[in-house]
Amino acid sequence: MFRERYARWMYEWETRLTTRDENRVVRPLEWGFDWIEPFLQSHGLSSAVPSSDALHDDAVAEAAMVRINQLLIRRSDLFFGYERPTDFRLEERHPELFPTNVRPETLAKDAEIKRLASEGKTEKAKFLRFTSPERTPYAENDLVNARWYPAAEHKDPKRPKQAIVVMPQWNADAFSHNSLCAIFNRMGISALRLSKPYHDVRRPAELERSDYAVSANIGRTISACRQAVVDIRCCVDWLEDQGYEHFGVLGTSLGSCYAFLASAHDRRIRVNAFNHASTSFGDVVWAGQSTRHIRQGLEEAGLTQERLRALWSAISPISFYDRIMSAEAAGGDKRALVVYADYDLTFPREYSLQVVEAFKRVGLSFEARVLPCGHYTTGETPFQYMDGWHMGWFVYRAFKALRQEGCGARSAPAKAVPEVEEDLVAR
């Protein structure tokens, strides 16, 4: 009885949170070949795109896009590969919120942050900037932005420098996950809080929300995913240049998908925290509550869940579970955390359970943690603290294990951790 009442209460709460924003826009289906054609042309694969006359036939266009996805899966080393940027630089400026909703309390918070900055009452922060290898029609989106949280120099000069790239959820404002980065600093781990494509300072002026990251434009969504993945890998390049030796990624929701794909194609990434995880990109968009407006546009064009799954298979983790355990990705050296929620209406629980089973099947070293809430309620009290604890404690232990490994320590699980270390993570 209690369980049923709790579930009903949680689903109602989750639904209220996913429906309170009224600025979601229903957009029609677009195939978006123009968004991925530059990559195909530069790699001698342009023949995969039908002629412009043929693309007027939706059946021909859909079949071609499915074939391109299959091609990108086979050549994912190229698709998620890149030319290393040459314009890495640190920029100082006052942090801004860049809200994605127009609720009065959010706009008031944004105005207050701007006021304090204009009066010199807030400190400037450092941001890593560079040009993304994946180019789009939006110059502001192609200038990558990652807030830099360097950890204090450790007293032991022989201790390896460790860093993590953090990617928040879809439509996150620019302050989301900043507190996690500060916690990692207290563990001696530096952090780059990466703005996803079309998010915060990278968001085109024509948008209120980060709609172009995930939309009814099939090709643009694929391009945004590729851009996010190569941007993560470029961040690791820069960290490597700064003398860092151990690398991790933490992604929430959409950021989790991006983080997984980056790790599956980069052997340097060994610590992996997937906060809300799913199998197929198309399944989440079709079945998730927060993407109802996207599904509406796709459904009006006659698409089905099964067909959408094929159209976005090249950006779906399910296509790369074997890849993440490959020798190329150094899968045997990776450690992973999967966090999912029992009452998730955005990343339905059934898909998260499939992730857990897939990780077991391929032999990835991982641990799973379950939250007694939903997707959006993860950001509410007390669940945000539970989620933060799971992620922080895992990241702390995983990086500690890498340090011990470097000292020749046994790779078996560590014994009970001293209370002082537990307190460090709790703070």
Predicted regions and their residues:
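The feature captures the conserved acid-bearing segment of alpha/beta-hydrolase catalytic domains
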Residues: A287-Y351
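N-terminal targeting or regulatory segments adjacent to alpha/beta-hydrolase or S9 domains
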Residues: M1-L128, A412-R427
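Cap/lid segment of the alpha/beta-hydrolase catalytic domain
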Residues: V166-Q227
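Proline/glycine-enriched tight loop/beta-turn segments at coil->beta junctions
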Residues: Y138-L143, A151-A163, R186, G331-D333
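Alpha/beta-hydrolase fold nucleophile elbow
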Residues: E240-S253
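Glycine-rich nucleophile elbow surrounding the catalytic serine of serine-hydrolase chemistry
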Residues: G251-S263
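Hydrolase active-site cap/lid region
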Residues: F260-R307
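C-terminal catalytic histidine-bearing segment of alpha/beta-hydrolase fold enzymes
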Residues: L353-R427
